[in-house]
Amino acid sequence: MADRRRRRRRASQDSEEEDESASGSESGRSFSASRKTRGREPEPVESPAERVAAKSDDESECVSEDGVGEAVLSDYDSADLEENGSHTEGGEEEEEAEHFSEEEASRPAAESKPVADAPTEELVEGEERDESVKEVKADEKGNLAGERQSGDGQESTEDPENKGSKGQKLDDDEDRKNPAYIPRKGLFFEHDVRGQATEEERPKGRNRKLWKDEGRWEHDKFREEEQAPKSRDELIAFYGYDIRNGTGPSDGRSYRSRKPRHAGSPSREPRRYREGDKSVRSSWQGPPPGHRNAPQSVTVQSGQPLAPLSAPKPSGRPSTQPPQRSFQGSRAPSAPHRTEGRGPSKPSLDGAPLRGPRSQPVEGERGPRLRGRSSHAVHADRSPSLVVEDICSEEEEEEGEIPTATTTYTAHHYKTEKERVPSPRKQDSGMVMEGGSAAGQVRELSPPQERQVEKKSYSRARRATRTRPSDLSKQASLDDSSSAVQQAPVAAKSESWQEQSEAGTQSGLTGLDQDLARLSLTGQNWAQNPPSYLQAEMRGIRGSMHMAGGPPQYGNMEDMGVGGGRAKRYSSQRQRPVPEPAPMHIGVMEGHYYEPMTFQGPIYTHGESPAALPPQGMLVQPEMHLPHPTHPGLHPHQSGGPLPNPAIYAAPPVSLSPGQPPPQQLLPPPFYPPPGVMTFGNTNYPYPAGGTLPPMYPNPQAQSQVYGGVTYYDTIQQQAQPKRSPPRRSSNPVTVRPPPPEDQSRKAAEEIRS
């Protein structure tokens, strides 16, 4: 209590002194003077004895107060003074501190005197104190409004600006103390439009715009005037062709050749347009697949090819041959069709319309071709390129996906090969094909074409296989074709065999081919299609043997694949084999172009798979297979599919007819998976194309043997070493051994828990 009183008294004294003093410095001095006088005022009243007693009290009081308390008091006092705003100068504060320390002794005496002596004095002092405190408070409120008072309860919370308008009631959004206060100043709030929203009336009616353009983002490129349909000229200016044309650019753009390797539905869809697009497809003959369309489109125009096709169909090859010559000497109208068919996508477009006619002409061609084999003239007419194209287009039609792949990849190869081969065939047949001879030379020059040849043969074989069934029905309808073809196939086949032997493919193969020819002859329909197919297969076999032996095989294979019943192919093959290192190419092609596994799987799926396999160098064997499926008696020893399995690697040669080259087929076509897939008459034979896969697919090999009733080994494919890739695949799955570790870790964790 005493301490509080003292503090109050000091505060009042200070304020009084401040009032008295005129300036800050003066007030500091007057402080000390007035305080000293005040402190001394009571002293005269005190008696000496009381003074002594007061002093002793003082000391006892001051020990607590002066020792520690003095500093504290002086702090409090200075704080009070500061709080009250009575002192604004540091000098004053220092003086006050000194004063308080001096006054401490006298003040306790003054207090103790009233307590001990006279309550009246105390009352008088108390009154003085109260008055002074009131004055100080009034002064503070008047002079110090708006200044922060630190924690003494006198702080003013209101801003000085708002103090004047204290009485006015503020809106919630303007009252800063209200949570609903909306700031109106500052960068962040310049976009705060709350409360300013004014609904603008939008035009009503049918044609009203749903948005306004004033506020439209600049990057919004929508222009109403651009929404109308564009004219054809505009479209062509924009995209380079009329994008509304369902067939795509029909100007023979090379990009058209970009067909999925599996020419399945894509090629079939285009078949509808094949007649129109064929010209583009015919470009196949030309450069690589990319350029096929443009070149061939020039060479073969839909009108021309169709007319020749229609003519040749009924008449068989004879009528077709001249048109072929007209096309390129080596290309028959059917060739253009096939070429078109081959065309990556266009062939498929053309395929639909041409399919019926094409298959018939093809059959007719085949029949004539078979005859033509006897008379190389037919083959010559259909230069290898023509033959290949025919087969490809047919295959594409029937086996949309695979042919496309073959066509796409081998298209340029075929072209080259065709160019090469035509001359040989033509020469052999005695027919002089200007284009053909040139092509033949080109083929001889370029070994890679042999790959193409193989692929050609593959596509042809496949097409033949595929088409054969369809062709059989069609051929049945063709009296000429069926009878002539049947008769011709034997002769053609025998000639083919002879040609093959001439080519130096394999005498054994020749025998096998002959057998196959006989088998194919057994059924008229089969005779027509199978004979050509078988011949193609036989050629393929020879080709595969050649592949083992050298390029000649390829030439033969190509011929076989291309013209199952075409003499041209044979002759061209014979000629090619020597100059062309087909085996390597075949292996490479098969290896790099079609993974034996990958490629053959799809091929089988097409049911033309046998044909597809030949391009891989297994084509030859597939040809053998075809005969077997066609004529199980042909190779009775091979009929035992399971037996070929064991022999697939080493014994396969034995299982295969003597004509077949077993050693070459070191790698049995392991990929004869879908016997059912081979939906030829020869569904049995799995194509050796999978030969490369033997290591991985020994069982498939067995299947192929079982299916063909003959052990089929693709020597080239076997030689090709893409087979190693399958093991990698198997290794990946095998590598999945993390699960057991997980179990162990779980067990360990369980043990730990337990």
UniProtKB/Swiss-Prot annotation:
Main subcellular localisation: cytoplasm
GO biological process: mRNA splicing, via spliceosome; mRNA transport; nuclear-transcribed mRNA catabolic process, nonsense-mediated decay; regulation of translation
Annotated Gene Ontology cellular component terms: cytoplasmic stress granule; dendrite; exon-exon junction complex; nuclear speck; nucleus; perinuclear region of cytoplasm; U2-type catalytic step 1 spliceosome
One example GO MF annotation: mRNA binding
A family per Pfam: Btz
Biased composition (Basic residues): 1-10
Entry-annotated residues carrying Phosphoserine: 477, 481, 483
Subcellular location(s) per record: Cytoplasm; Cytoplasm, Perinuclear region; Nucleus; Nucleus speckle
Keyword list, A-Z: Cell projection, Cytoplasm, mRNA processing, mRNA splicing, mRNA transport, Nonsense-mediated mRNA decay, Nucleus, Phosphoprotein, RNA-binding, Spliceosome, Translation regulation, Transport
Entry superkingdom: Eukaryota
Comp. bias regions, Basic and acidic residues: 39-57, 131-142, 160-178, 187-235, 268-280, 414-428, 743-754
Biased composition (Polar residues): 294-304, 317-331, 470-480, 495-509
Region (Disordered): 1-511, 709-754
Ranges of Low complexity composition bias in the record: 22-34, 481-494
The keyword Transport is annotated on this UniProt entry: yes
Cross-referenced SMART domains: Btz (SM01044)
Database matches in PANTHER family: PROTEIN CASC3
Family recorded in the similarity comment: Belongs to the CASC3 family.
Subunit note: Identified in the spliceosome C complex. Component of the mRNA splicing-dependent exon junction complex (EJC), which contains at least casc3, eif4a3, magoh, nxf1 and rbm8a. Forms homooligomers.
Protein name in UniProt: Protein CASC3
